[in-house]
């Protein structure tokens, strides 16, 4: 979604080259072409770029500033021309998401643009119903049905790293490696293309290997702080009664679990409540932010 502070904003649901996206963006240019803009990327994770102010709960690179987003953005009012956030809001409660958008509005200059990317609840529901309505005789229905249910629900209920989505990736990768049947191979290729058209990519790495790789990389010097923080949380969790342990562990998977879902209507209304206007839908290829796709 792109939006403007008392101007317009942009909402994008699933910013992938091959996936349907929802974007809301403003119509007016916020800066003359060639003039340097101040740009903020909050909740950036591992996706950040020079020329932007990148902030997140944990820093994975010197270009990323460590900030507790739920305590507010450490910037003065009207500091930025552009605010961007991709796949962040869905990991927070609606109340927390509203606070983050209020902070974004506060730090944006008049006529500044916000561009928000979240999973598209409407598209997921429509695709689920479309697959469900396919005849049972369709040989590809079962696999597609399994995937769309995982895509819709897994990150809402996930209680372990990678969840059912990781298991699906592993099974698909292994099946394609092992099959010698041409018909089965084509069926698996069709399934892979279907999933890629939905999410944009499928990890080729065995989720189990990726799990251990993550833990090895976590001990690199720049990640030691984050590693120790998570180790501390899990140690505390281990000392809690079983009834509370799962709740605490779930709280440590904020980067994986979804706390809410949005569509064009709900996210547009939320942006308007905060103060944004001129909300529109766009895709990953279009933006009124000058040179946005060059970053």
Question: What do these predicted ranges mean?
Answer:
Residues 38-72:
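Class I SAM-dependent methyltransferase SAM/SAH-binding core
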Residues 91-92:
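A short His-aromatic
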Residues 98-110:
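A short glycine-rich, Lys/Arg-flanked "PGG" loop and its adjoining helix->strand segment in the class I
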Residues 15-36:
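Short, Lys/Arg-enriched N-terminal segments with co-localized hydrophobic residues
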Residues 70-82:
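A short acidic, Gly/Pro-enriched loop at the edge of an enzyme's catalytic core
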